[in-house]
Amino acid sequence: MTLDIARLRAETPGCAHVLHLNAAGSALPSQRTLDSTLDHLRLEAEIGGYEAAAKAHDQLEGFYPAVAQLIGADAGEIAFVENATRAWDLAFYSLDFKPGDRILTCMSEYSSNYISYLQVAKKTGAEIVVVPDDNYGQIDVGALERMIDKRTKLVSISHVPTQGGLVQPAEAVGKIANAAGVLYLLDACQSVGQLPVDVAKVGCDFLSMTGRKYLRGPRGTGFLYARAATTAGIEPIFLDNHAAKWTGDNEYTMRSDARRFENWERYFAGVIGLKVATDQANELGMEAIWARLRELSEGLRVRLSALKGITLTDLGQVKGAIVTFSVAGADHLAIKEKLRRQAINVTVSTQFSSRLDLKNRGLLNVMRASVHIYNTEAELDRFVTALDAAR
């Protein structure tokens, strides 16, 4: 399928106001997603929140098969969660770590996840083991295969890190984890919506995702994929009367599906908005979206490489829509602010979010420009010209 870029831009209100190169932070939503979210909020105001939810029952239930279609799962393996970090937390903290258990992760791991590793290690005596990178700067799957053993409780990586275009070889990692009988948690915060993800091929037990980034959904939305066979043996760290039923004075019974990871209260308008955004991704097709993002990001890398004093900092054999770079002798935060005044949105990734990777490479921070399908080649030209003038 060929994407109609002019139509996509016309259906994205923000395109008329900003040159948005921060999809990896929070992408511009479509008018359709915006309308569906606002319509439900208005309905809540007009007839009441409970009543609005009852009236929107079919839309709310439609969220689960929409997400399942996107990632190749079953609807019963999907839970709505308010963001990717909380979805990840629900999976991670529900695991029963014991002294000596090993958590295998990667150099490019996200700070929130790593802080959780540290906390669990401190409380339980589990050990954190960082698998080294290969020559491409991605996780060395050969090293992973050698390092995984009977002590390994979990393999946990970020599919696409926040600080660059690297796409980790998630399927290769999954094959190794599955062969060893080890649980596999994939942070797909930056990958789902950007590139095709099939959980059966990836082989993950859990996958966490946010709505606001490449799916172009509302903030405050996300989901957790929990493989049915894995869910059956895990009790979530939190339960309420949505995740479980109070079946006797001293008894409760959990739901049998992934919704045991949900709680009763949620952002109902956001569920509908994320469902609509997911529908749009399914309609456009992830192969077409991925092809467009690869084209734009490679075009941006070529343009940046032509500027004196610009060094690309992306790693990986396969690179995606997040483009990071450093500007010699410049204050990246000051450049970001100068661009913002021109209605050009980029951001700066720091060791705060990517300590292991950036520190290992001697980088305090890097500039990050992340494209989406609504961006154009003309916008890339404008950005590079403005960047050159801002340093």
Regions found by a protein language model. Give the residues of each.
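Pyridoxal 5′-phosphate
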Residues: M1-R391
